[in-house]
UniProtKB/Swiss-Prot annotation:
Keywords: ATP-binding, Cytoplasm, DNA replication, DNA-binding, Lipid-binding, Nucleotide-binding. Residues 83-124 are annotated as: Domain II. This is Chromosomal replication initiator protein DnaA. Disulfide bonds: none annotated. Plays an essential role in the initiation and regulation of chromosomal replication. ATP-DnaA binds to the origin of replication (oriC) to initiate formation of the DNA replication initiation complex once per cell cycle. Binds the DnaA box (a 9 base pair repeat at the origin) and separates the double-stranded (ds)DNA. Forms a right-handed helical filament on oriC DNA; dsDNA binds to the exterior of the filament while single-stranded (ss)DNA is stabiized in the filament's interior. It comes from Rickettsia massiliae (strain Mtu5). InterPro entries: AAA+_ATPase, Chromosome_initiator_DnaA, Chromosome_initiator_DnaA-like, Chromosome_initiator_DnaA_CS, DnaA_C, DnaA_dom, DnaA_N_dom, DnaA_N_sf. The lineage of its organism: Bacteria, Pseudomonadati, Pseudomonadota, Alphaproteobacteria, Rickettsiales. ATP binds at G171, G173, K174, T175. GO terms for cellular component: cytoplasm; plasma membrane. GO terms for molecular function: ATP binding; ATP hydrolysis activity; DNA replication origin binding; lipid binding. Oligomerizes as a right-handed, spiral filament on DNA at oriC. Its main location: cytoplasm. Signal peptide: none annotated.
Length: 463
């Protein structure tokens, strides 16, 4: 963790030192990605009447910290100094920090000379089903939703989250949010130039431009927009030429205060076969994780969809779908559509028994199959370590112990052999896995807290 810039005031060094401890505790508790997104640019300003005043870099960061972390921060301050009664988080320009905004020369679509860049064609790539109005918000996606709204509502200026990096599994709503940003801008600020595109299509158009000697037109197309949204950026991993072009496009847009929104199936730090300089830039702004859906969120999604379709579905059927279709939102909505279509075509009433029969094959595929990769991701997240640490040889206790726990769970919850498990952990041999399992078993005999922790991890993975 890099050391924060500390601003000394006439209140003395005491509160400054306390803030440095609090910042370290936040880093240790929440991990590098979340710390860098929210706390790394927060500074101690002063203290007044037992109130600590902190400064956040933007209104968005200030409001999010206030709503989510203010009580935790206060408790940490009080742990080190019990005279502190409250905290206040403000935003203001700090002395010595200046912002330079370089405006791009304004171009119209006609200036660019590409039929692909007229507004009608750009917005024709957006799915009419994906708007903010029909996006169901819950705990797993509330940060991503709030950040996407902030980008869309930035009224022509760059948002406070630039770039916005959305990551998570398939079918959890990343693409929905990107389309929603596009539609919001179309309806409220149609003069802004927006491109939404998959990383695969970006690569295809770049290769085509190289072949047709139209690279200059390609560069103008992507570097003159107000908002560039690239979906599934992991596709350019290992594609050196495309990475190089993306790197320069990224720099041009960010340097000229243009907005970028990027989606991926993993966090920037977990991307393989991509240049470090690109990894670094992807994490410059706000990194928002879209988690797997909870039962409550799935229930909300189904109820919203049913209301939109103006159909009647028995409550026990809705509960059944929310409980059994747990993989992703796309499959959940597909299951609902299948049940409704079957009823419309056969004129049969929608009942729980009929639903179970209609979705028999889908339900079988949704039975929970736990993989070593699932275990590694969940344990890494639980202990705030990088996923790459699972296959590393680092021996620090804070890395080695979670890795041993993941090996133990892999043996307990999957049919994999010790040798197969070892391959998943950086090609370690079976004796290393055996030693890890034995070590955890020994600890479990006397460590009640660890026993409860592993039981909790098992329940999370199995459900």
């Amino acid at each position: 963790m890099s050391t924060n810039q500390i601003i000394l005031t006439d209140q003395g060094d005491n509160y400054v030192n306390v803030w440095s401890h609090v910042a370290q505790d936040l880093y240790n508790h929440y991990g590098e990605t979340l710390y860098n997104s929210w706390f790394s640019k927060v500074n101690f300003i002063e203290s007044s009447l037992n109130t600590v005043i902190l400064c956040a870099p933007t209104n968005f960061v200030r409001d999010w910290i206030k709503s989510k972390y203010s009580m935790v921060i206060l408790q940490l301050f009080q742990h080190y100094n019990n005279t502190i009664k409250s905290i206040e988080i403000i935003t203001k320009e700090l002395p010595g920090i200046t912002q330079t905004v370089i405006a791009l020369p304004t171009k119209t679509f006609a200036d660019i000379g590409s039929s692909e860049l007229n507004a009608e064609n750009i917005f024709s790539t957006l799915d009419v089903r994906f708007t903010f109005d029909n996006f169901v918000v819950g705990a797993p996606n509330e940060l991503a939703y709030a950040a996407a709204r902030a980008v869309a509502e930035s009224s022509g200026a760059v948002s406070e989250s630039n770039p916005l990096f959305l990551y998570g599994g398939v079918g959890l709503g990343k693409t929905h949010l990107m389309h929603a940003i596009g539609w919001y801008i179309k309806q409220n600020n149609p003069s802004r130039k927006v491109i939404y595109m998959s990383a695969e299509k970006f690569m295809y158009q770049f290769v085509k431009a190289l072949r047709n000697k139209e690279v200059i037109s390609f560069k103008e197309k992507f570097r003159s927009v107000d908002v560039l949204m690239i979906d599934d950026i992991q596709f350019i991993c290992g594609k050196d030429s495309t990475q190089e072009e993306f790197f320069h496009t990224f720099n041009t847009l960010i340097d000229n205060n243009r907005q970028m929104v990027i989606s991926c199936d993993r966090s920037p730090s977990d991307l393989d076969n991509i240049e470090d300089r690109i990894k670094s830039r992807l994490g410059w702004g706000l990194v928002a994780d879209v988690h797997s859906t909870t039962y409550e969120l799935r229930l909300g999604i189904l109820e919203s969809k049913i209301e939109q379709m103006n159909v009647k579905i028995p409550k026990d059927v809705i509960d059944f779908l929310a409980s059994k279709i747990v993989s992703n939102v796309r499959e959940l909505e597909g299951a609902l559509n299948k049940v409704i279509a079957h009823s419309n075509f056969t004129l049969k009433e929608i009942t729980l028994e009929n639903t179970q029969n209609i979705l028999r094959d889908l339900l079988r595929s949704n039975e929970r199959i736990i993989t070593v990769e699932d275990i590694q991701k969940k344990v890494a997240s639980r202990y705030n370590i990088k996923l790459s640490d699972m296959s590393s040889s680092r021996r620090l206790r804070e890395v080695a112990r979670p890795r041993q726990i993941a090996m133990y769970l892999s043996k307990a919850l999957t049919p994999k052999s010790l040798a197969d498990i070892g391959k998943k952990f950086g090609k370690k041999d079976h004796t290393t896995v055996m030693h890890a399992i034995k070590k955890v078993e020994e600890l479990l005999e006397n460590d009640i807290e660890l026993r409860e922790e592993i039981n909790l991890l098992m329940k999370i993975l199995q459900n």
